[in-house]
Amino acid sequence: MAQRDEPFAVFVFGMRLNSVRGLPRWLWGLRVLRAVEADLRAHPERGFLAGRVYRTGRTLVAVQYWASFETLDAWARDHALPHRPSWQRYLREALADPSVGLWHETYLAAPGTWEGVYMNMPPWGLGAGADLIEMQATKGSARARLREQRKRSSRPPETP
């Protein structure tokens, strides 16, 4: 079971190939995404906890876990980091050609408002970036586990 007694942020984003003429830009985006994730993993001090990229058909989806919204926001705004020039290039090109779509969602999670349960799994999802604890048989329901999380931390969720 994943345990994190501090609020954190979940950043979900993706890229969709809307037209075959956008394939070169979509493939370029995939290369950029891999490079950005490698850079984030090399610099955990930036607040990146864990993440994974998925491909389904013509859509890429990335799920990232961050130490806080502030660390995610600071990373996104830092012009010196590798993702920034790629993002600016994408914005310029997207105005001229909608063949590749981009989207993102940001969620803030406070202790007691989420759970991650992993059985017979390698580190996965938030469990790859949080402390893992053995689930106790006496706390077998989500309700009991979430109640326990809320007891450990009385801080409200952080807001941007």
Per-segment meaning from a language model:
Residues 58-60:
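A short, glycine/Asx- and small/polar-enriched loop/turn
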Residues 1-56, 74, 98-160:
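Short S/T/G/P-rich N-terminal loop/turn motif that feeds into the first structured element of a domain
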Residues 69-101:
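An amphipathic, aromatic/His-enriched active-site/gating alpha helix that lines ligand/cofactor pockets
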